[in-house]
C-alpha cells in the first residue's frame, strides 16, 4: 500500500480551491482560528477560576466526639 503522495495532495488541494474558492477558504480559516482562540481563552479562564476557588476555600473544622 502506497499511501498519499505529494501529487495526490496537490490534486485534492486544487479541487478544494475550485469547489469553495479562495474567499470562502480564507473565511473558514479565520473562523477556525477565532474558535480555537476562544477555546483556549475559556480553558485558561476556567483554570484561573478553579485555582482561585481552591485558594479561597477554608479548611473544615474538626469535630471531636465525646465517649
Swiss-Prot record:
Gene Ontology molecular function terms on file: protein transmembrane transporter activity
Phosphoprotein as UniProt keyword: no
Membrane topology of the entry: Single-pass membrane protein
Protein keywords: Cell inner membrane, Cell membrane, Membrane, Protein transport, Translocation, Transmembrane, Transmembrane helix, Transport
Pfam families per record: TatA_B_E (PF02416)
Disulfide topology: none
PANTHER family: SEC-INDEPENDENT PROTEIN TRANSLOCASE PROTEIN TATA, SEC-INDEPENDENT PROTEIN TRANSLOCASE PROTEIN TATE
Protein name: Probable Sec-independent protein translocase protein TatE
Amino acid at each position: 500500500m502506497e499511501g498519499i503522495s505529494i501529487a495526490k495532495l496537490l490534486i485534492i488541494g486544487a479541487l478544494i480551491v475550485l469547489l469553495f474558492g479562495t474567499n470562502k477558504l480564507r473565511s473558514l480559516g479565520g473562523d477556525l482560528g477565532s474558535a480555537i482562540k476562544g477555546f483556549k481563552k475559556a480553558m485558561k479562564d476556567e483554570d484561573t477560576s478553579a485555582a482561585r476557588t481552591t485558594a479561597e476555600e477554608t479548611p473544615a473544622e474538626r469535630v471531636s466526639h465525646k465517649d
